[in-house]
From Swiss-Prot:
Pfam families attached to this UniProt entry: FAM117
Gene that encodes the chain: Fam117b
Name of the molecule in the record: Protein FAM117B
Keyword hit for Phosphoprotein: yes
Top-rank taxon: Eukaryota
The keyword Phosphoprotein is assigned to this record: yes
Amino acid sequence: MSQRVRRNGSPTPAGALAGGAVGPPGGPGSRLQPMRATVPFQLKQQQQHGSPTRGGGGGGNNGGNGGASGPSGGGGSGGPRTASRSTSPTRGGGGSAAARTSPTVATQTGASVTSTRGTSPTRGTAPGARSSPPRPQPPPPLLGTVSSPSSSPTHLWPSEVIAAPPSARVRHRRRSPEQGRPSAEKRSPSAPVCKAGDKTHPPSSSSSSIIRRTSSLDTLAAPYLAGHWPRDIRGQAAPCMRDKATQTESAWAEEYEKKKGSHKRSSSWGSTEQLKEIAKLRQQLQRSKHSSRHHRDKERQSPFHGNHAAINQSQAPAPKSTLVPAGPITKSSGSRFRNSVEGLNQEIEIIIKETGEKEEQLIPQDIPDGHRAPPPLAQRSSSTRSIDTQTPGGADKGSNNSSRSQSVSPTSFLTISNEGSEESPCSADDLLADPRDKENGNNSPLPKYATSPKPNNSYMFKREPPEGCERVKVFEECSPKQLHEIPAFYCPDKNKVNFIPKSGSAFCLVSILKPLLPTPDLTLKGSGHSLTVTTGMTTTLLQPISMASLSTNTEQERVSRGTSTVLPSASLHAPPEPIEEAEG
């Protein structure tokens, strides 16, 4: 860098180059800009480019420019700072002081030092500044320290700066040539002009962002810091504020409303707000877990639940005190913290099981209707009879024939619930069931639609026939018909099983006409590629056969097969002579 600056011919351009190095947040910095997300690169660049020049530059030659740029930010202001350094030797000391003051100064000092080498005696201090940049790297707070130099200055002492010079120099030299070319060309005419050029041209993309960042370095530094330090700081302060609030419903409700509103806005806010909310939620969940697990007794005796604890002997209030914080936590924290909430729910269930019968009596009062199932009916069912308890009782005590019909039919429920004795409904069901079985349910329309059959077939599944339809007895439909009633035509013939047509025709003479054929006379005449049976057959049956066109070979095959199968099946004793084959 320093050599190129010297070539340009003015120490101030060298300073400008140093500024360019400072600008590297601007000039080459623009190329490195995407890396700013990672703290170490930013720390290296800004520390190397900006530190001593800021302290000295602001107070020294640059005067207003350097001073303004020094506080504002390492990137844009670096250019003027370095220029001021190169002009006066005092900046060497100023640079070291600046390095002490702000970490970003260290980054600028490296660049400015290189530029100042050619121009002014400050090199001695400048090298110290150069050496400083490597150590400024460790302090990620650079961004944060830009606003407050006191935090990181310890990293940049002149002695330390001097110790590390070679690495810093190498880094600056590597980065500087890129920076130096545009910066030297643009900055060479004069230092102030070069400063403007540095900010505008090479850093245009990065320097503009740098300027924006410098204006709001506090807000920008916060996200980096929020990732590490501020969470702990905020977390430490928050629990002290909220330990008291966790004990009361009102405080929880207020916090929940605040959180709810903040979450709605957090998407548009900066990442710092989101991080704050997350940290708060974590702390609250941890407190709620800790308090619910380790401080249940304290919560039960808390002032808000004091009355309940005194009345209920700290049985009912325990679940209540845990339920109150659970609601807002689940809604505000979202799915991210479900595990902890589930843990709370499990603990509540354990508490409810431990409390026992007293808990059962008290909980329905505490919990609004619709949130809990009704208490079991075990006590009432023993003394009074209800529909729920009738099916087992009736089946056990009733007669075998009518017990299930009682439990099934609605009339049995009515009679059992209204009448104290169990025998009277049984007799009533018997009266209903017997004629119903005999007359297929004509007398009793209501019990016809029973839901379960009886093993003794006293009641069958039945349904009223639709209007205009005849009632048919079930037994007639279900009873299998005897073989003698079925006509022989429908019966399968054993001889048919062996018959397998190969022609692929759907109409088979033998299989269809076999039972109807007369015994002696069967003549198959093949004329014009068609088969016709002359005796005992109606034309309607033979039409499909005559329609099929067959080759003589297939006809012969069919005839031979037909005779072989028909003769035994129809018990034809005549030889196959009467069959005549006429080929047309």
